[in-house]
From Swiss-Prot:
It is a peripheral membrane protein. This is Protein translocase subunit SecA. Its cofactor is Zn(2+). One of its GO terms (molecular function) is metal ion binding. Pfam families: P-loop_SecA, SEC-C, SecA_DEAD, SecA_PP_bind, SecA_SW. ATP binds at Q86, G104, E105, G106, K107, T108, D537. It is found in: Cell inner membrane; Cytoplasm. NCBIfam families: PRK12904.1, secA. It comes from the Bacteria. Part of the Sec protein translocase complex. Interacts with the SecYEG preprotein conducting channel. Has a central role in coupling the hydrolysis of ATP to the transfer of proteins into and across the cell membrane, serving both as a receptor for the preprotein-SecB complex and as an ATP-driven molecular motor driving the stepwise translocation of polypeptide chains across the membrane. The gene is secA. The keyword Phosphoprotein does not apply.
Amino acid sequence: MLSIARKIFGTENDRKIRRLRPMVEKINALEPDFEALSDDALKAKTVEFRERLDKGEKLDALMPEAFAAVREAAKRALGLRPYDVQLMGGMVLHEGSIAEMKTGEGKTLVATLPCYLNALPAKGVHVVTVNDYLATRDSEWMGRVFAQLGLTTGVVAHGMTDPERRAAYACDITYATNNELGFDYLRDNMKYSTEEMVQRGHGFAIVDEVDSILIDEARTPLIISGRTEDRTEFYKTINELIPLLGEDCYEIDEKARSILLTEEGNEEIERLLNERELLAEGDLYDVENIQAVHHVNQALKAHKIFVRDKDYIIKDNAVVLIDEFTGRMMPGRRLSDGLHQAIEAKEGTDIQPENQTLASVTFQNYFRLYDKLAGMTGTALTEADEFFDIYKLAVMEIPTNKPIARIDEEDEVYRTLEEKYAAIIDEIVDCQQRGQPVLVGTASIEKSEIIDRLMSDKALFKKMLGHLYPKDEAAKAEFEKSARPVERTLPEMLKLIPIEHQVLNARYHEQEAFIVAEAGVPGAVTIATNMAGRGTDIQLGGNADMRLDAWKAEQEAAGKTPTQTEIDRQADAIKSEIAEKKRHALDAGGLYVLATERHESRRIDNQLRGRTGRQGDPGRSKFFISVQDDLLRIFAPERLDTIMRTLGMKEGEAIQHPWMSKALETSQRKVEQRNFDIRKNVLKYDDVMNDQRKAVFEQRIDFMVSDDVADVIKDMRQSTAEDLVSAHIPPKAYADQWDISGLKEALQETFGLNLPVEAWADEEGIADEEILERVSEAADKAYAEKAANAGPELMRRIEKSILLQAIDINWREHLQNLDAMRSMIGLRSYAQRNPLNEFKTEAFNLFERMMDNLRGEVTKQLMLIRFERAPAPPKEPEGLTATHIDPRTGRNEMADPGDGPVAPRVAPTQRRVSTPAHPNKPETWGRVARNAPCPCGSGKKYKQCHGAIDGAPTA
């Protein structure tokens, strides 16, 4: 019934799209008018639009003309005309929503439309990409569109200096990665003057691959940290205890990836720790022993939860983490709270010191700083509820410009892993013999290497899968009665092994570019962990640019310098060869995505499917499933076993049935909901910290902006006096209960004042309020004399410097306390208390204590300071580490470039305010990326056209 109603009335998404069409028609109607404008007149439109804004006109009213201007600028600068569906995508982004646009639909060009419109108020627009290469490429390529309209474009990339970053953020449109933006925000809040800050606010941002950044990375905070003391021997000692614990000493929750000590485990670990004198006096869970217990729990996780070659690998005597979404190495990333050190101790590698958090923020809270936020991706609808719940972002699916020709086949489900692997190898052989390129998608390094070995090793294949293959024709005839028989006998299969193939996973990251480039060649077989290199096109027939570059490198290695004529001849030969191979691949059905198991999220499955059938090309995708796969084994064992028994499946049979599809979808929904709950729970805790973070950062900036913080210092001095007096003379206490000697000592230590407190206390009828008043007067008088000796200008500078440094020191200690409390607060649930409510209460108490310490430290330093010479300006901490991983690059993007392709060093800012690009005037083109289309309109890439002729600098 519902499907019939949808056919008649359309879906909600269809109705929203229909509402956009009148605006598209308006923009199309304006096209002839803008085509008639000269380059100067087109650029002058920006000035006109800004003047109209100043007079009170709204951005929405300007949208038809602004979009028409961008369309015309794109035609002139790039030779590209945004389609109607791209205009719709731009409208959705301008509304502050997420546009789901399939891969290959031109999201990069779509972003220019809302970017231009929202840059008109001159508050800056940020375009967020997933790596430096894309930020650089897009800023240079799309920057030519903005230059045609008189706007400036900047790019922020790893390794740039603060002045370069400041210049980039000052541009109308700034391209940057999510990591650079987040860390610049944190670093700005560690600066000691507003002039040193690089960002200028958070107005409007468009996030590319928004699902990856705002969902996949939401649980991982951005952290700036510094080194702490070396505790190598402590980690080693704790590590030696874990093998001594029996299985009755702990309980493992595979779904939650957690482990807890049982009552027997608590008793045993307490005994072991006492034997090694690692416990302070008292109970195991006394405050003094929390650190030891914490490290025991982390060591348990390292031994029982984290698996080598699945969660991490050992490379160059170091533990390198593996990204759960891409299966790629993440060099530079380290687990926090001592867990990474526990894994290092387990594996016997060098143990690196822990880091202390100096500043941190999650992407969830960073991107909620923006006044308006929008996003683009090819896969967002499955997470629409989360986008709206967390970020208040609606998701709209934009129609494709050409119909999708990909065929998504039903899943094939087997009872055992061996049966599944046999069917996969059989399918791969069939495709290779027909010349169809195959991309084999796996969820982990371990799974990719199993298939790799089965395709390479005859003995292993025979040992693991031989019993599944018919031995003779009679057996084969019997076997063919099954739902999906293996088509060949064992001798036939063994003749075909080894099967030529390539492996793309964390171990072979260095070869990624070449492997991806060749994945579309007829008969190519590429094994890849959940597609490393998302955003990299697999071109049917091969990659002409890469082959030409390889040929040039061979020529140079042989000591030859090819002429331009030779290069052109070779390029034509390569293109001709690739065109022929592409026809062969298309005839065989296009790229076949063969997935070896379902991922935890339907969205990840859709990303894998999206690797084929791009831009109207034919393609095919299918998932091969086993009941023993992790997803089904953990989340749907009973239901699937019942289905299998009901259907009476035999050995080697595959099933394709609606019941099975429903069970698979139910399992994925369970995992998606669990992960959503985890992210939502993380956000609830981080919101507590975020409120405190915003309060501290905002107050800190106020102090930086202010020329005079004397009133703040006076209030702190008064509060400190009140704290000291009330601590030693409690309110409503009798005089004989006063700690006068303690007060005198505290005043001497904090204020440097030797006051006659004993005499004051002996006075008839004196009260604590009067003693406080005398202490405050004496402190104010002493401080005034100190300020007069220093001079007002020097004193104001000293006050601000000490205040800012004290805020930083206390905030870092506060973060460390919050982290420690957060890791242990879950234990309160055993006392029937709500951990979140407990965290809120404890976090507030810690914040109050931090503020008390801050006031006391600032007061003490200023009261005791000596002016022998002017103090040096405060410096930022040295030896800091910035940590966050981009799932697509598989490494800490803030570290120095490591394995794999990285972006080239970029100029600090590309300011494009000069003459717009003209096809016949190379001098107007400015800096052009090598892989961008040549501005002359030839259709070639720049490096194959004018870039190869005039030797222009490469990007």
